[in-house]
Amino acid sequence: MITLIAAVAENNALGKDNQLLWHLPEDFKRFKALTSGHYIIMGRKTFESFPKPLPNRTHVVISRQKNYQPEGCIVVDSLEKAIEVCPKEEDVFVIGGGQIYKQSIAIADKVDITRVHHSFEADTFFPEINLDEWQLVFSEFHPKDERNQFDFTFQTFVRK
């Protein structure tokens, strides 16, 4: 199963200058719980935005740079090759960035979103979720608090 996972603003903003636009510890906790022990597919810039590789996950990085080989990662030059290197029986998570989401939404089985209830100026956006193709099967609202600076909702969509 291929799942897209992302934190997305009301205007579908993902980030700016290769950085997230908010700090939501509850979102990080959910991301870790869902992706731990699985293959995660990402673009090079998304990988480079992490201070170090994420523990307990197999990193598949998509890059067109020929000699790009960060330690402990599988590097491929296309989304198709990224999917091919992941075991078929595994749950695979696509974790960004914007172009990788745009390419992969057509082949995804599921989308796990943290919808941040605010709009931001951004340079990277998540593709529209077409409700003719996707069904919302889970929604859980969380008000902002001392640790999470914005209201947000965990949402899960499955392909119809």
Residue ranges, per PLM feature:
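Enzymes that bind and transform nitrogen-containing heteroaromatic metabolites
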Residues: 1-160
